[in-house]
């Protein structure tokens, strides 16, 4: 099922509407609602005389709506710093509408989201009146949970013993981690992610060891991250190269021969497909999965089928439970408009999975984002082995 892909081609004309386009319009509408809200009368905050005296300044004497308008020009980091100065600003900077604005503004630009940080879409769809009157959601807490910079900071504060344990454990691990890579992004993009990987000097690709060969699949490709962390990828295509090329030229979807479809009477949530025996052998030996999604904004998706394919591949019946899933939210080149990774995560129903996952923005041409994703999945495998 292995093959090669063309590196470049002509972009197909985008259809008039896309899944992401509709949500993008809703988010832009949310921004406008925010700016309208700050100009309307809102319930005034009550503060003691002592607090007013403590925070007495030109800014605090302004109407609260004007204060919030000014605060909206600060970065979230600066806003948190301001909140640490005194009790008045600590209360003021927590305004739910202000943080809802930041969340709607910044969420589409974040390059990764994981199983711990995916925000509930319901909190983004809440009418502005409910946010103002009820404030049921702590939007500041949601923002900090989702923000990649916050996640990175908490990751760097990991206890030292965890790193030492992982290092000692790695000394007795003989085989490098092995991953199964599959998904429409391997086949539909005008630039081949696989060819970019195979020509990467940074990853040092070499043929896998013959003794680890799987009949009909091969032994995969060995890579090396930062000249020390070795890993192996088994690249799985849905069908033959000839059929993939024809589907790309005709702008259709090739029949995916990795899976067999269940009868309608046997259909269960997320299990409309099962892997064929040949692929099942792959699922039994890998340490994790890499799903390459087509994240180009004009692309129409069969989200339920994609979710079912992921569920079939990661079925714990064919291997240990809790194996990590890396989703590469992939586009051909940097100038192609992409759908945000949080939207792709929701549409793939990744919140229904019972194992760690990460969605990482990636460019096939430059491999931007790929190394970040690989670092994450290698850390997850190390952590799982050390437990």
Curated annotation (Swiss-Prot):
Every F-box domain range: 56-102
Locations listed in the record: Cytoplasm
Signal peptide annotation: none
Record has Transport as a keyword: no
Alphabetized SMART domains for the sequence: FBOX (SM00256)
Modified residues (Phosphoserine): 12, 48
Gene Ontology CC entries for this record: cytoplasm; cytosol; SCF ubiquitin ligase complex; ubiquitin ligase complex
GO molecular function: protein homodimerization activity; ubiquitin protein ligase activity; ubiquitin-like ligase-substrate adaptor activity; ubiquitin-protein transferase activity
InterPro entries for the chain: F-box-like_dom_sf, F-box_dom, FBXO4, P-loop_NTPase
Highest taxon of source: Eukaryota
CDD domains noted in UniProt: F-box_FBXO4, FBX4_GTPase_like
Effect of residue 76 to T: In esophagus cancer samples; impairs interaction with SKP1
Pfam family, one: F-box-like
Keyword set, alphabetical order: Cytoplasm, Phosphoprotein, Ubl conjugation pathway
Mutation effect (residue 23 to A): Abolishes homodimerization
Effect seen on changing residue 13 to A: Reduces homodimerization
Post-translational modifications: Phosphorylation at Ser-12 varies during the cell cycle. It is low in resting cells and high in the S phase and the G2/M phase of the cell cycle. Phosphorylation is decreased during late G1 phase. Phosphorylation at Ser-12 promotes homodimerization and is necessary for optimal ubiquitin ligase activity towards CCND1.
Record annotation: effect of changing residue 12 to E: No effect on homodimerization
Protein name stated in the entry: F-box only protein 4
Native organism: Homo sapiens (Human)
